[in-house]
């Protein structure tokens, strides 16, 4: 979620829907590239991840946030564009490492733990960014000062997870067959992810250009995500004693796919409301992806980073395509 919230740092001539979209696009491309690159090395040598300096990626994020914040204060368009792209790349690389790291550590934990941790993390993230957005808009708090502590806090949590002993068998040796088996178990989820990510990217970009601001387009969805997170946590607490959580998630996914296929036809009614509903649905699906990916990583004793990078990377590609289509559609009078 950090990837999409970096745009609140833009100010002055940089604070336009087009440049906000540019920051998001460059950042998630760098995010995806980092995920694929680290996963490629880890597939050959699982110990690669443990040798990566987490503090370096934290520093990249913080440096990128500062560069993006400074870019809008400059009058020179060429310099501003260079700083925006450079800052977005730095943050994207750091975010890619962070996302993969959480997939790696959660993949070492028993699914009974991750089924609660994942929606709880989603709840805390949505709450944090809603507070940051409202503070920046209504309290005139500097967005940069609100954003900078977050990568440090996340790194501290990652260090705490690194010190834990894995619950089950951990992937310390290379076994391509186990990776293929794990991915095969997620095929339907991956296909659904491609469809939903494309449609979400499409509606998100159309909403941003329609209301003229990424921040405005995100506030209602953040509230919707809070509601979704609370409902998912309630489902998890209920499911521990009453039903199979994985089965419940597999029932929820087709419902979300159908909603995503139908909702764009109601675009003219209210773009912001439609974006909020689709964001809530996508937030639900994002939690399901996290849970199923880390559960598969645990069950098949493979790296959560590698499996997560493949699933997440494909999702990002589909979202990029959706954003591109949405941008082109909004150019049509």
Locations of the language-model features?
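Intracellular juxtamembrane helix-capping segments at the cytosolic ends
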Residues: 95-109, 284-301
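C-terminal transmembrane helical hairpin of 12-TM major facilitator-type secondary transporters
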Residues: 243-286
């Amino acid at each position: 979620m950090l990837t999409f919230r970096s745009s609140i740092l833009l100010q002055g001539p940089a604070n336009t829907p087009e440049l906000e979209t540019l920051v998001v696009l460059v950042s998630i491309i760098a995010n995806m590239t980092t995920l694929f690159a680290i996963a490629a090395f880890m597939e050959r040598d699982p110990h690669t991840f443990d040798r990566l300096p987490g503090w370096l990626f934290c520093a990249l994020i913080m440096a990128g946030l500062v560069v993006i914040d400074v870019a809008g204060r400059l009058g020179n368009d060429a310099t501003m564009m260079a700083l925006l792209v450079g800052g977005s790349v730095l943050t994207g690389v750091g975010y890619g490492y962070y996302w993969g790291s959480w997939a790696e550590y959660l993949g070492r934990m028993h699914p009974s733990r991750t089924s609660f941790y994942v929606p709880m993390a989603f709840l805390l993230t949505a709450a944090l960014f809603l507070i940051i957005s409202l503070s920046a808009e209504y309290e005139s708090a500097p967005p940069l000062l609100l954003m900078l502590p977050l990568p440090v806090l996340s790194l501290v949590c990652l260090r705490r997870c690194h010190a834990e002993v894995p619950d089950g068998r951990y992937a310390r040796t290379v076994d391509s067959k186990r990776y293929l088996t794990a991915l095969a178990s997620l095929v339907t989820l991956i296909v659904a992810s491609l469809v939903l990510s494309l449609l979400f990217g499409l509606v998100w970009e159309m909403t941003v250009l329609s209301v003229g601001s990424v921040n405005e387009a995100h506030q209602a969805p953040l509230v919707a995500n809070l509601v979704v997170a609370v409902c998912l946590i309630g489902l998890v607490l209920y499911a521990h004693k009453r039903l199979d959580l994985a089965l419940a998630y597999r029932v929820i996914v087709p419902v979300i796919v159908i909603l995503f296929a139908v909702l764009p036809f109601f675009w003219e009614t209210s773009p912001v409301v439609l974006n909020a509903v689709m964001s809530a649905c996508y937030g639900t699906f994002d939690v399901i992806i996290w849970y199923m990916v880390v559960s598969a990583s645990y069950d098949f004793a493979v790296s959560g980073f590698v499996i997560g990078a493949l699933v997440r990377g494909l999702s990002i590609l589909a979202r990029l395509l959706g954003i591109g289509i949405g941008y082109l559609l909004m150019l049509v009078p």
